Amino acid sequence: MKTFTATPETVTRDWFVVDAEGKTLGRIATEIATRLRGKHKPEYTPHVDTGDYIIVINAEKVTVTGNKAAGKIYYSHSGFIGGIKQISFEKLQAHKPEMIIEKAVKGMLPKGPLGRAMFRKLKVYAGTEHNHAAQQPQVLDI
């Protein structure tokens, strides 16, 4: 019996919606990254994108434990000399709450073309509204 290998044509992708309200950032991000990669499926193949589409709502209500709300710093660099920028978790949550979950999940995905394709299947929204009702997403309880 030959080992089954998934191909892009044979992969079936489902849509799931995740409510991040009151959830811990790292715990929700690991589950999302696992499902984006497709590791929860029996037909998982490392070199093929077998993951599902994930819609995250209420990203503005995600939590972190301890003093990380004030102490966690996100860094970015413009590419110019002295162009490093930093922003705390609290300020980023008030300004762009989607970016918190996106950065956490992106760091858990593979680096390269396959990881970028997996990341494109993540849709994050600050509030409860999303525009993917036509895909009939199933509720995923994490």
From Swiss-Prot:
- InterPro entries in the cross-refs: Ribosomal_uL13, Ribosomal_uL13_bac-type, Ribosomal_uL13_CS, Ribosomal_uL13_sf
Alphabetical keyword list:
Ribonucleoprotein, Ribosomal protein
Keyword presence, Ribonucleoprotein: yes
Biological process (GO), any one: negative regulation of translation
Q: What does the entry list under GO cellular component?
A: cytosolic large ribosomal subunit
Q: How does it assemble?
A: Part of the 50S ribosomal subunit.
Concerning its family, UniProt says: Belongs to the universal ribosomal protein uL13 family.
Protein name in the entry: Large ribosomal subunit protein uL13
